[in-house]
Amino acid sequence: VPARRAGVIDNPYLEWIGADIRCDPWAYAAPGWPERAAEMAYRDAYLSHRRNGVYGAMFFAAAISAAFVLEDPLDAVGIGLTEIPAECRLAKDIRWALGKTKSLSGWQEARALVDGRFQGMHAVHTNNNACLTVFGLALGCLLYTSPSPRDS
């Protein structure tokens, strides 16, 4: 079987997070160069994934690469979005999550929002996990940048 076709044969996991999990080294190999990180992630992800499974790896590799040179992790998310098709489902879902971050009250609300939007989607699908990551970064920024009760 040619390598370019191997990923689609008897593979129901084409849009799951397997390629996302493998994308970190591409970002580390190209810190501050998200285009290159996304390109390397694409080459790797295409062996086992398609569509949003590939786009997720490209998005995360680019975002991690950008995070090396940016202060705000959500700015890195924005850079990651520039490396995937603007109208793919994953990009639309990430933009949805970004739009919810300003009013997010905590992890329970984040989980409820994702569960509501992605009803019936498997827990290890790329899209719902990307949105949870965006929410985690947003909530983490709030915790990191808000004054600690101990500072009072």
Residue ranges, per PLM feature:
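Conserved small/polar residues in nucleotide/adenosyl-binding loops
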Residues: 144-151
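Amphipathic alpha-helical interface segments
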Residues: 1-71, 75-87, 96-98, 116-120, ...
